[in-house]
Amino acid sequence: YTGSQYNFNKRNKYKNNINPGHGGSYGNYENEVIAGNLFNYPYIHGKALKENGYSFVSCNKEAVTNGMASIIDYDMIDLILGEEKETLTGKNKRYKTFPKELQIALQDYLDMGGNIFASGAYIASDILENENCEPDDVVFLKTILKVGLGESKFRSNGSIESANSEFTSFKHPFYHYCQVLNEKKYAVEAPDALIPANGSQPILLFGNNPGAVAAVAYKGKYKTVISSIPFEALTTEYQRNKWMREIIQFFETK
């Protein structure tokens, strides 16, 4: 990776290094090492669970949607979405955050009084700004998960802080997440700014704009914590352990 692509015209041919034609990219990262996806997120999430005294098992979404794995009997679901969003690959679209089969499985789980923690940079915009979105997708996001979209591609300084809410489990004053490209951890450069929906409350705010919401929580027949900051993007293990502890305490509080 050398920088953002600026030439997308397939008719532009290579002339020289100054005019490279189609596929031309900026070179501002030519001398930098940029961290990619290490696919170690189940380990990072699982380690935080273990540090808080809990065991865990992991599986991919497809194992749930095709019936190979059942989530009904678990006290808590930690849904890892990272920077996943529906993407055109060749002629097909893949990586939708909440495909229909997953929506059904999660709703069945919540109907049994379950607890879901879901974190992903595009957790709201992948549905609400998707031209192929269906009414049922919007209902699932806003009515079941209890979250809406305030602004997509939100620019932050990488700090998030606790909001004033009735949920006393969430009291850690601030966290930091990685938002700048670097060699150690993948960066979340432009996450969603969220809004509460159907009874949820803000629990984390972006530090550079206290009106912008980074996470919401809902307590009713079931409980949800929805964050646009991927859990694994928090910069230190201490912060991840603390955030996971607060989520667990919220789920366990009657």
Task: Give residue ranges: language-model regions.
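The substrate-binding groove and active-site-proximal loops of carbohydrate-active enzymes
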Residues: 28-37, 79-97, 230
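Stable alpha-helical elements in mature extracytoplasmic
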Residues: 41-45, 98-105, 240-247
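Extracellular/periplasmic catalytic domains that process cell-envelope and extracellular macromolecules
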Residues: 50, 69-73, 109-112, 195-197, ...
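Solvent-exposed loop/turn segments at secondary-structure junctions
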Residues: 63-66, 81-87, 116, 122-126, ...
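A glycine-rich, often tryptophan-bearing local segment used as a flexible ligand/cofactor-contacting loop or short
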Residues: 85-185, 200, 205
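A glycine-centered loop/beta-turn motif at secondary-structure junctions
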Residues: 115-118, 148, 173-254
